[in-house]
C-alpha cells in the first residue's frame, strides 16, 4: 500500500503560483452558491498536506505545499492544523444528516483526541453553513469542503453566514478525492492551513458572460456604424467629385461656345462713359480681350473664365450659362443631357442681330457688345426665311419659335413686335 507520492513531488517548487492563476480564472467562471457575496474579495489558503505512510514497520512522512484552497467569506482568516477526518459511512460524506459522526483518532497512549479537521463533500441538499456548523459541534478545529464530482479542481468562495466559529476552506474535487482515498486506505493525512493572498473582487460566470456580450454588442455596433458612416461619406465624396468634374468639363465646353471680342479704340466700353470689368474693377482699354456671356454682360477673359469654371454663372446677374446654352445637368447621377433646339442656328443668328440693336440703348454693363455695323432688319428677316426653308427640306413637319434672348426684362419693353420671328407649322 504505497502513498500518493506523485502529487506531492509534482507540486513542489513553483507550481503553486501557476495553479493559483488557473483557479482564479475558474473561480470567476464557476457558479456561486445562493446568497454568496460575489463582489467581495477572496483569500486563498496555503495547504501543507502530509501523509504518514507505514512501510515495513517504519513510518515515513511525505508532504506537499501548494496554494489550492479558498477561505469562506464568513470564515476567520487565521491558520489552523489538524488531522483530516471524513464523516463516518460512505453515504455520509456530505454531512447533511444532523446525526452524522466523525471517528477522531486519539493521542497515542491516551483518550485525548488530536486536533482534527472535518473533510466534507459539497452538496447533499444542505448549505455550507449546515456542514460547517455540524463540524464545529463535533469538535473540529476547521472544515475542509471539497467540490462536486466532475468539477476537477474548481473552487468557489463559499458563503456561510452564522457559521463563522471555525476556519472553513474549499478545495477542488480532485484534491479532496485523493485525500479521501488515502484516508480510506488507512493513511493518516494531516493538513496545515495558512492564510494566502487576497484576490478580488470576484464575479461569477454570469456576470462575466453579461459583460462580455454587452461589450461585444457595443463594440460591434460602434464598428458597424463607423464603417457605414465612412462608406457613406466616401460614396458621397466620390459622387460629389464626379459631379464637380463633369460640371467643370461642361463649363469648359460652354465657355468655348461663348463669344470673344477684342476691344478697339472708339468702342462704347472705352469711351468717356465706359464701364469697368465687374471682376477686377479695372477700366476697359483698347486691345483688351473680353468674354461676352449669354446675358450680354462682358468681362475680361482672364477674369471671368476661372469664375465660370467654378460657378458657371454670370458674376453680376447669376445667369446660368449651361442652361442658357441648352445644357441640363442631372443632379441625381451627374449625367448631362444636351438639349439644343432645331432652330439653334436661327436663334443664334436672330439673337446676334437683336443684341446689336439693343446695344444702342442699354448701359455698358447690360448692353450688347456686338460690332458697330448693324445689318438692316429686312436683311435679318430674309436670312431667317432662308434658314427656315433649309429646315423645311430636311424635315416634313417642324414647328420652331425663335425668340430672342433678353438679358433684362426692362429691355423687353423697347422691343418692337416685328423683331420676333415666329415660324408656324410647315407641311411639305
From Swiss-Prot:
It is found in: Cytoplasm; Endomembrane system; Cytoplasm, Cytoskeleton; Cytoplasm, Perinuclear region. SMART domains: RING (SM00184). PROSITE patterns: ZF_RING_2 (PS50089). Keywords: Cytoplasm, Cytoskeleton, Glycoprotein, Membrane, Metal-binding, Signal, Transferase, Transmembrane, Transmembrane helix, Ubl conjugation, Ubl conjugation pathway, Zinc, Zinc-finger. GO terms for cellular component: cytoskeleton; endomembrane system; membrane; perinuclear region of cytoplasm. The chain crosses the membrane at residues 208-228. Its EC number is 2.3.2.27. Auto-ubiquitinated. Controls the development of T-cell clonal anergy by ubiquitination. A zinc finger (RING-type) spans 277-318. It catalyses: S-ubiquitinyl-[E2 ubiquitin-conjugating enzyme]-L-cysteine + [acceptor protein]-L-lysine = [E2 ubiquitin-conjugating enzyme]-L-cysteine + N(6)-ubiquitinyl-[acceptor protein]-L-lysine. One of its GO terms (biological process) is protein ubiquitination. Its main location: cytoplasm. SUPFAM superfamilies: PA domain (SSF52025), RING/U-box (SSF57850). InterPro entries: PA_dom_sf (IPR046450), PA_domain (IPR003137), Znf_RING (IPR001841), Znf_RING/FYVE/PHD (IPR013083), ZNRF3_Arkadia_E3_ligases (IPR051073). It comes from the Eukaryota. E3 ubiquitin-protein ligase that catalyzes 'Lys-27', 'Lys-48'- or 'Lys-63'-linked polyubiquitin chains formation and plays a role in different biological processes such as modulation of immune response, cytoskeletal dynamics or protein homeostasis. Inhibits IL2 and IL4 transcription, thereby playing an important role in the induction of the anergic phenotype, a long-term stable state of T-lymphocyte unresponsiveness to antigenic stimulation associated with the blockade of interleukin production. PANTHER family: RING ZINC FINGER. This is E3 ubiquitin-protein ligase RNF128. It comes from Pongo abelii (Sumatran orangutan). The gene is RNF128.
Amino acid at each position: 500500500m504505497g502513498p500518493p507520492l506523485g502529487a506531492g513531488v509534482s507540486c513542489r517548487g513553483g507550481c503553486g503560483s501557476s495553479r493559483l492563476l488557473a483557479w482564479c480564472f475558474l473561480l470567476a467562471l464557476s457558479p456561486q452558491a445562493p446568497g454568496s457575496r460575489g463582489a467581495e474579495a477572496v483569500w486563498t489558503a496555503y495547504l501543507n498536506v502530509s501523509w504518514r505512510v507505514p512501510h515495513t514497520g517504519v513510518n515515513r512522512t511525505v508532504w506537499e505545499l501548494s496554494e489550492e484552497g479558498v477561505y469562506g467569506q464568513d470564515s476567520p482568516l487565521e491558520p489552523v492544523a489538524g488531522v483530516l477526518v471524513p464523516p463516518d459511512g460512505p453515504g455520509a460524506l456530505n454531512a447533511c444528516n444532523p446525526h452524522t459522526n466523525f471517528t477522531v483518532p486519539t493521542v497515542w497512549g491516551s483518550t485525548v483526541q488530536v486536533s482534527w479537521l472535518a473533510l466534507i463533500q459539497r452538496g447533499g441538499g444542505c448549505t455550507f453553513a449546515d456542514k460547517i456548523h455540524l463540524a464545529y459541534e463535533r469538535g473540529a478545529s476547521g472544515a475542509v469542503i471539497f467540490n462536486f464530482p466532475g468539477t476537477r479542481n474548481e473552487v468557489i468562495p463559499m458563503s456561510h453566514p452564522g457559521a463563522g466559529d471555525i476556519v472553513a476552506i474549499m478545495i477542488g474535487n480532485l484534491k479532496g478525492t485523493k485525500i479521501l482515498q488515502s484516508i480510506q486506505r488507512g493513511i493518516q493525512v494531516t493538513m496545515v492551513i495558512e492564510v494566502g493572498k487576497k484576490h478580488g473582487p470576484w464575479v461569477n460566470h454570469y456576470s462575466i458572460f453579461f459583460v462580455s456580450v454587452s461589450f461585444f454588442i457595443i463594440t460591434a455596433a460602434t464598428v458597424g456604424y463607423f464603417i457605414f458612416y465612412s462608406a457613406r461619406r466616401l460614396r458621397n465624396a466620390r459622387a460629389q467629385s464626379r459631379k464637380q468634374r463633369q460640371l467643370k468639363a461642361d463649363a469648359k465646353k460652354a465657355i468655348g461656345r461663348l463669344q470673344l471680342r477684342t476691344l478697339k479704340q472708339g468702342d462704347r466700353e472705352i469711351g468717356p462713359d465706359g464701364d469697368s470689368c465687374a471682376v477686377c474693377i479695372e477700366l476697359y482699354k483698347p486691345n483688351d480681350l473680353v468674354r461676352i456671356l449669354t446675358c450680354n454682360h462682358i468681362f475680361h477673359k482672364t477674369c471671368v473664365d476661372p469664375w465660370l469654371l467654378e460657378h458657371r454663372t454670370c458674376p453680376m446677374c447669376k445667369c446660368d450659362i449651361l442652361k442658357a446654352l441648352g445644357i441640363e445637368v442631372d443632379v441625381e447621377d451627374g449625367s448631362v443631357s444636351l438639349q439644343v433646339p432645331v432652330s439653334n442656328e436661327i436663334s443664334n443668328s436672330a439673337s446676334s442681330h437683336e443684341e446689336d440693336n439693343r446695344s444702342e440703348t442699354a448701359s455698358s454693363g447690360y448692353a450688347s457688345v456686338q460690332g458697330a455695323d448693324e445689318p438692316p432688319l429686312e436683311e435679318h428677316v430674309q436670312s431667317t426665311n432662308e434658314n427656315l426653308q433649309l429646315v423645311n427640306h430636311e424635315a416634313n413637319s417642324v414647328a420652331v419659335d425663335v425668340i430672342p434672348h433678353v438679358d433684362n426684362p426692362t429691355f423687353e419693353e423697347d422691343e418692337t413686335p416685328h423683331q420676333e420671328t415666329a415660324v408656324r407649322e410647315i407641311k411639305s
